[in-house]
Amino acid sequence: MTTDELKSIFQSYCCKDGDSPGKKLFGLEYENFVMIPKVDDTTKTFEPLQVEGDKGVFRILENLADLTKEDNDPLEKVYEKGMLLALKRPSGAKITIEPGGQIELSDAPRNSLSESNESLQNYLRLLKKAVAEFDGE
């Protein structure tokens, strides 16, 4: 495979055309583990939030959806076989739970790094509110 062929494959997969010819958009994916204080631990150490249960990552999806239900671009719940697996916004962003329990934001395509940064900062502020009941970080 030549360098030009490899570049062409990369560009066709990673670069989607925007509203105007020659304009490219890009999307951010951001994964993180939510860490909570260990119970009865005086050393102030943290452990990953459980995947299931009342204090699990799926509860965070519920919290995120509740926090945005009055927004212009709310996070809508996505179920599979009766189980909440993800959230999605009408604008194209998605929040999923990855196999290791990490939470992933797959942001909608953006025009600039500034737009991506603003979106990421908004997501992190929202996530901080969603994990507040767990004393999470």
What are these regions (language model features)?
Residues 1-137:
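Terminal catalytic/cofactor-binding subdomain
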